[in-house]
A protein has these predicted regions:
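Small-residue-rich hydrophobic transmembrane alpha-helices
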Residues: 1-20, 57-76, 184-248
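Structural signal for membrane-spanning alpha-helices in multi-pass inner-membrane proteins
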Residues: 22, 65, 91, 95, ...
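Alpha-helical transmembrane segments of multi-pass membrane proteins
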Residues: 37-60, 187-193, 259-262
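Short runs within selected transmembrane alpha-helices of multi-pass transporters and secretion channels
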Residues: 50-68, 76-84, 105-118, 200-204
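Membrane-interface helix-loop junctions in multi-pass transport and translocation proteins
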Residues: 84-118, 248-250, 254
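Interhelical loop/hinge segments that connect adjacent transmembrane helices in multipass membrane
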Residues: 109, 120-156, 162
């Protein structure tokens, strides 16, 4: 529970810092990331609203893990489902009905994440949870949150590297290929996410199973769980990539009707 409380405090502090830094420097950063004169206004409108809701986003991303590790996989899944469904409902209302455009898309995302954050905090402070979020455990202690940061470094480096590569690609494409090239890259990235997100779900879902059996000193079950995950990921990735290679235009058409981009 001390780890839970310390991680919550770190997330709150990080969200405050990120909100201030990125809100103030949003236009400059977007330029650095490759936004052109045409896309800068839209990107800035979306970013400023999304940044203001970074607290809710970080709570959902960071605290939902504590629900999964306790064995409440369904509750954890409902967090994602609730956010996704609300976002799907609000997007067309804000974008088209209210005519808010990009700002509406950002607001819909923030509101859906806020509902997910409330859902998580209500569960972690409720009676069903095994580990309860308490104010007394929110005082930062290096010996408590230090190991958490150490364990997260590898994931941080991996995701940061992916982000830097994405920024580099976008900036280069914007400079040498224009908005059409950036749009094409965005479509490719979206298609790749269709592949990677289920893989992340499989791997994250297997983490508690492997952890429980490792702690119970059952190496055979750990190996079986890993082998099952590995084979599932290989089969899914191979099948999906084969379909995309055979029908590339069909997948591109999901995200745009522009023939030039397709």
């Amino acid at each position: 529970e001390k780890i839970l409380g310390n991680c919550f405090t770190l997330l709150v502090g990080l969200s405050i810092i990120l909100t201030i830094v990125f809100y103030v420097s949003a236009p400059t950063l977007l330029r650095l990331f490759g936004a052109s004169d045409v896309t800068l206004t839209y990107a800035s409108d979306y970013a400023r609203i999304y940044i203001l809701g970074s607290f809710f986003v970080l709570i959902v991303l960071g605290m939902n893990t504590f629900i999964t590790t306790q064995g409440f996989a369904r509750i954890s899944m409902m967090t994602t489902v609730i956010g996704a469904v609300i976002n799907i409902i609000l997007d067309p209302i804000f974008i088209f009905v209210l005519g808010m455009g990009v700002k509406g898309a950002a607001l819909a995302t923030v509101l859906s994440q806020s509902v997910g954050a409330v859902w998580i905090l209500r569960f972690l402070t409720g009676k069903k949870t095994i580990l309860r979020l308490k104010r007394s455990n929110m005082h930062l202690e290096l010996k408590v949150f230090g190991p958490c940061l150490a364990l997260g470094i590898s994931t941080f480096v991996m995701l940061s590297t992916e982000s830097l590569l994405s920024i580099s690609f976008t900036s280069s494409l914007s400079r040498f290929g224009g908005d059409v090239a950036v749009g094409a890259m965005t479509i490719i990235t979206s298609i790749s996410q269709l592949v990677s997100l289920p893989l992340q779900g499989i791997c994250q879902g297997g983490q508690p199973i492997i952890s429980y059996n490792f702690g119970a000193n059952k190496p055979n079950r750990v190996k079986k769980a890993f082998f099952t995950q590995f084979c599932t990921c290989i089969i899914y990735t191979s099948a999906f990539c084969l379909v995309v290679m055979i029908f590339p235009k069909a997948f591109a058409a999901i995200f745009t009707s522009d023939k030039e981009l397709v």
